[in-house]
């Protein structure tokens, strides 16, 4: 489960870091049978997020071991409000990958939305910074997983252009159905390029709903 989803979030806020209660989520996850938490770095840089300090990383490791959890993914929401086309943002990703490697993280999730929205028209612009980030991740044995609004065919084109073995795809069931994509067709097309899955459901108004009550089949 994604970090922050086991704590009551502020009104209207779905993706957030539970600043005052982040440690408790690890024990809650263990108690309800969840075996791992996907860590997040926020849309605005937060120096108090434990991912940014060695002391914080030690705390995370201790909590994971104490609660018998796994730890293999980190999502960098920072690029949602800060364009990856900016050199400083690319460097933020590289710094975060180095921190993630200290935790043994295997997957680095990059959500290409809003300020970093990646489309068929602009994908050439993103190749250089994306390759730069992915090459750093490769050094640390980390796969970079791209979450985008692209269709399956457009994603295949992007992966061919990037042409790096550690660049893969995030398949988010809710987002895919919200954009009218062919879920089954895309899954068959992307096949082994799907490295990470976010399972959620959405209704016709693009609202998150309980699994099984929306448009995802």
Spans of features found by a protein language model:
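Acidic/histidine-rich catalytic cores of soluble enzymes
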Residues: 74, 128-215
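Active-site acidic/histidine proton-transfer and metal-coordination neighborhood
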Residues: 24, 63-67, 81-169
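Hydrophobic faces of well-ordered beta-strands that scaffold small-molecule active sites
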Residues: 1-4, 10-11, 37-39, 71-76, ...
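Glycine/Thr-rich phosphate-binding loops of Rossmann-like dinucleotide-binding domains
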Residues: 47, 118, 207
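Structured loop/turn residues at beta-strand edges in well-structured enzyme cores
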Residues: 32, 69, 103, 165, ...
